């Protein structure tokens, strides 16, 4: 699980170069990276929005999984 500092650094990188931020999180040969690359070429702001979405909101259940477990098992 990445720390808050790592997520913040990825967001800053995603604002400067959106495909690079997605590449750090998902890899360079993924569909998410290609979508971000196309969105950045078509318009810089949509690329930023998508990169932040990928970094922050995808697979967020991994971060909150420990809070969903029951305290007592029956």
Swiss-Prot record:
UniProt entry tagged with the keyword Membrane: yes
Chief location category: membrane
Pfam families in UniProt: Pmp3
Transmembrane segments: 4-24, 37-57
Membrane topology: Multi-pass membrane protein
Record key words, sorted: Membrane, Transmembrane, Transmembrane helix
Subcellular location: Membrane
A cellular-component GO term for this protein: membrane
Source taxon at top rank: Eukaryota
Annotated PANTHER family: HYDROPHOBIC PROTEIN OSR8, HYDROPHOBIC PROTEIN RCI2 LOW TEMPERATURE AND SALT RESPONSIVE PROTEIN LTI6 -RELATED
Family: Belongs to the UPF0057 (PMP3) family.
Protein name per its UniProtKB record: UPF0057 membrane protein At4g30660
Organism for this UniProt entry: Arabidopsis thaliana (Mouse-ear cress)
């Amino acid at each position: 699980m990445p720390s808050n500092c790592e997520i913040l650094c990825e967001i800053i990188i995603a604002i400067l170069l959106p495909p690079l931020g997605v590449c750090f999180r998902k890899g360079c040969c993924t569909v998410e990276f290609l979508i971000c690359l196309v969105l950045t070429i078509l318009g810089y702001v949509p690329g930023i929005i998508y990169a932040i979405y990928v970094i922050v909101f995808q697979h967020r259940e991994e971060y909150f999984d420990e809070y969903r477990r029951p305290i007592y098992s029956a």
